[in-house]
Every structure is written in structure tokens, then in C-alpha cells.
UniProtKB/Swiss-Prot annotation:
Residues 297-330 are annotated as: Disordered. This is Cyclin-H1-1. One of its GO terms (molecular function) is cyclin-dependent protein serine/threonine kinase regulator activity. Keywords: Cell cycle, Cell division, Cyclin. One of its GO terms (biological process) is regulation of transcription by RNA polymerase II. The gene is CYCH1-1. SMART domains: CYCLIN (SM00385). It comes from Oryza sativa subsp. japonica (Rice).
Length: 330
């Protein structure tokens, strides 16, 4: 059985907050420079080997004069959170297990540590991450089925498969907190010497913790903490609601058996920080995303900005003409 302690997940994909900020900032800066140099951020992806090609440089008289504005780091963050929630919605619609949803979201998060959303549209990458997660977790769904189920061209899924895998460095084994929750709840039954009544209450604790993990997956926590830490943070929050056991005593029991080098006070601090990240989570609505989505569309296809301006001008002209006609009729 695979072991998290010796995994690439633990070795290569758990970061400090500053590391994440640096990576997102670098990707945003690169995309911004691409927009200035080429007049667009769109990269062409070879579907066979995942190699990239840039467009022809924009003429000197066009560079910097198109009026297309790059997304800010904060706008990129909102875009990522929005599509991470979309991953959950799609997986729920297909009735995929939590493990597939979690793996797809972690793939998505890892991908956008390498790239800006201005370089690869998250709607397309989202689908490829779900498809890749299904393959790795042996829940076989064809690209055609997935595309048809959400009314998207399945070829987009396949075209982005290699660039996603390469961006993940082919580290495809992901550890999610859901399995850790199951293990800890079983352990809590022994700790509480649970009878029939306690057993049902522990199952309620488990279900609430799973819902808490669903929220955690939309924060930075999966890139900052181990699955075990995430699971215990979710169970701690759930226990605050159900009040089934003395959680501090339970943690002491876990630490005494695992002979952990980490002081329990430090671990409790991590749990509190994870739950703080969840409390701070704000999921943008489609209305919130409208302006950001328009900016992204213009970055990927600057000609769309001209079309948008023409429509706005035409709409204003119609409104003005209607107002004039109304005055003539009065």
C-alpha cells in the first residue's frame, strides 16, 4: 500500500505560504509580459507532446496600445476558486467519489502553480483535471462521456491532457483527507469505547467533517498541510458542533502512539490555521466573475475587446435613439 510519508505528494507538493505567493506572482508576471510582447496571452498547445508555441510578436504600433488589461493576482485567485468549485459541481453531477473530486482539485491547484489563468483557460484545464483524476483513480469515464455530460467539446479535454500531466511532473498519486477521516473515526470509536448510541453520533461527526473538508479543498490548505492535518482539523471543527469527545485528550492519545517529533501545541496551531482559512473562504458568484471573465477573454483574444466595444457603442446608440423618439412622441 502506498505510504504518504515516502510520497512525492509529501516531498514535492507541500509548500510554505510565501512559496505559493512567489509562484503565483511569477506566473502572473510572465503572462503580463507575454500580453505586452505578443498582444495576447494565448499559448498554442501541441496535444501530442504538450509542447507550447507563442503567437507572432505584435507589431510595434500595437504593442502596449491595445488597451487590454492583464488580470491581477487577486483576480486570478478568484478565478481559480470559482473553477475549483465547478470541479466539485461536475463531480457531484456525475456522482463521482470524493477521492476523484479531491484529486482533480489538487491537480488543478498544482497546475496553476506553474501557469497563469491568462495562459490556459481554467474552464478547459478543469475538465482535463477531472478526466485525468478518473483515469488515475480507475473510475473509467471517456472524454466523450465527460464532455457530453457537461455540453463541452471532448477534444479540449484530450488536447490539454499532456500539458497538464507535464505540469504535474507526472506526480499523479494524490492523498486526500477523506480516507484519513475514516481512519480517525474508527480510532475514535476505540478511544470512546463507543456503544450503539455513540457509534451513530460518531457517524454524524464523520459526515460533518467530510463537508468541512469539501470547503477546505477550495482554500490553499491542501498545498500547505498534510492530509492527516486537514482531516484532524475537520474533525475538530465537527466535534465543536457535535461535542462527542474531549478532542484535546484525543490528540494527546494520537501523539503518544505516533511518537511525533512535532510538539502538540504546534499541531494545534496548524489545525486552528486550517479552520481559519475555511472561515475566510468566499466563493465568488457568476455575477462577481463577469468582469474578470471578460478581462480574461480579452487577454486570450484581444479582438473580442473590439467586438465588445462595438456592441456597447451600438447599445448606447439604440438607447439614445429610443430616448429621442420618446421625446418626439411626447
Amino acid at each position: 500500500m502506498a505510504d504518504f510519508r515516502t510520497s512525492t505528494h509529501r516531498e514535492r507538493w507541500i509548500f510554505q505560504t510565501n512559496d505559493l505567493m512567489d509562484r503565483w506572482g511569477a506566473a502572473n508576471q510572465r503572462a503580463t509580459e507575454t500580453l505586452v510582447q505578443y498582444g495576447t496571452t494565448r499559448l498554442k498547445v501541441d496535444p501530442v507532446d504538450g509542447s507550447l508555441s507563442y503567437p507572432e510578436p505584435a507589431p510595434d504600433h500595437v504593442v502596449g496600445s491595445s488597451g487590454v488589461k492583464p488580470l491581477s493576482c487577486e483576480e486570478e485567485r478568484l478565478m481559480r476558486v470559482f473553477y475549483e468549485q465547478k470541479i466539485q459541481e461536475v463531480c457531484s453531477a456525475f456522482k463521482f467519489p470524493h477521492k476523484i473530486q479531491a484529486t482533480a482539485i489538487i491537480y488543478f491547484k498544482r497546475f496553476y502553480l506553474q501557469w497563469s489563468v491568462m495562459e490556459h483557460h481554467p474552464k478547459h484545464i478543469m475538465l482535463t483535471c477531472i478526466y485525468s483524476s478518473c483515469k488515475v483513480e480507475e473510475n473509467h469515464v471517456s472524454a466523450e462521456e465527460l464532455g457530453k455530460g457537461i455540453q463541452q467539446d471532448h477534444q479540449i479535454i484530450l488536447n490539454n491532457e499532456m500539458i497538464v500531466l507535464k505540469s504535474l511532473d507526472f506526480d499523479l498519486i494524490v492523498y486526500a483527507p477523506y480516507r484519513s477521516i475514516e481512519g480517525f473515526v474508527d480510532d475514535m470509536e476505540d478511544f470512546c469505547r463507543a456503544g450503539n448510541g455513540e457509534h451513530q453520533r460518531l457517524q454524524d461527526l464523520r459526515q460533518t467533517a467530510i463537508s468541512q473538508v469539501d470547503k477546505m479543498m477550495l482554500t490553499d490548505a491542501p498545498l500547505l498541510y498534510t492530509p492527516g492535518q486537514l482531516a484532524l482539523a475537520a474533525l475538530h471543527k465537527s466535534n465543536d458542533m457535535h461535542k462527542i469527545l474531549n478532542f484535546e485528550r484525543y490528540l494527546e492519545s494520537v501523539f503518544s502512539r505516533q511518537h511525533s517529533d512535532c510538539p502538540i501545541e504546534q499541531f494545534v496551531g496548524s489545525i486552528n490555521m486550517i479552520n481559519y482559512l475555511v472561515e475566510q473562504l468566499k466563493i465568488p458568484t457568476p455575477k462577481d466573475m463577469r468582469h474578470i471573465d471578460r478581462k480574461l477573454k480579452h487577454c486570450l483574444d484581444p479582438s473580442s475587446q473590439d467586438e465588445h466595444k462595438k456592441k456597447e457603442k451600438k447599445s448606447k446608440h439604440k438607447s439614445k435613439r429610443a430616448a429621442n423618439e420618446a421625446q418626439l412622441d411626447s
